[in-house]
Every structure is written in C-alpha cells, then in structure tokens.
C-alpha cells in the first residue's frame, strides 16, 4: 500500500469529520452520512491510487441483524460501512478516544468493550445491546477480536 494513499486516507478522515460535523451534531443521520461518505471515498481512492478493487455481493441486510465478520484489515470495516444502511460496531474501548473516528463511531451507536477482559467484554456488550440505548441497525462484531 502506498504511503501517499495512507496519508490522504487519514487527511480525508479529518476533512470529512470537519465537513460533516454540523450535520452529525444535529442528528444521527448526519453521522451516518459522514461515515458512509468517507467509506465511499476510501474505496474510490484505493482503486484509483493503489489499484485495490472491491466488490460487495449478496443481499444486504437492512433490519436489525448481527453481522459476524473476519477482521483482516482496516478495509473490511470500510466495505461494511459502505454496504449496510445503519452499521454499528463492537469496538475496542481505546478507539473511542481516537480523534474523529471515535466520536463518529460513538455517534452512530458503536458499542465499546475492553478487549483484554473477555468475560467482562461479553457481559458489557450484551448489557449495552439489551439496554435499548443503542440505535437500531446492523451490529457488526469481529468474533476473533483484532485483525490478523
């Protein structure tokens, strides 16, 4: 992967975050729009800059479903966000402190868990889902945890 692609990807994360901030503050739809627009940008720029083609196949779930996926790279999250209408991830707790990424993740309803504490993570994840505070949508979990 080229350094130029990685640089522009992080630069555009900040740009998209700032551009969509007013809409994301007003409502969750604005946050989804920001996240999806950024995902489309990354997919397009990956194809244009490094020749990475991506394809989404099959029926895209629209209701409240659980999607279990294998976490191979940053790109699998990009593909899922660009495909499903209301994605929300189970994400490691430290990501909520990441500038732009963390705030928008929380805004779309991502659920944070402590990665190293398996039993506690499962309990807090189930409690968060059952609380009803998380918005409706597609819950994405990477059962293996981190990317390989």
What are the functions of these language-model segments?
Residues 48-148:
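Soluble catalytic domains of membrane acyltransferases
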Residues 1-55, 103-107:
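A transmembrane-helix-recognition feature enriched in membrane-embedded lipid enzymes
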């Amino acid at each position: 992967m080229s350094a130029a692609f990685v640089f522009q990807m992080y630069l555009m994360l900040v740009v998209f975050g700032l551009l969509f901030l007013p809409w994301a503050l007003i409502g969750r739809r604005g946050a989804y729009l920001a996240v999806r627009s950024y995902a489309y940008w990354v997919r397009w720029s990956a194809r244009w800059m490094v020749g990475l083609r991506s394809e989404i196949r099959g029926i895209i779930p629209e209701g409240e479903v659980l999607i279990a996926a294998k976490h191979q790279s940053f790109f699998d999250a990009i593909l899922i966000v660009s495909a499903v209408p209301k994605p929300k991830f189970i994400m490691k707790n430290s990501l909520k402190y990441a500038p732009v990424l963390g705030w928008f993740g929380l805004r779309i309803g991502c659920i944070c868990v402590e990665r190293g504490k398996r039993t506690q993570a499962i309990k807090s994840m189930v409690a968060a889902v059952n609380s009803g505070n998380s918005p409706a949508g597609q819950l994405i979990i990477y059962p293996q945890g981190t990317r390989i």
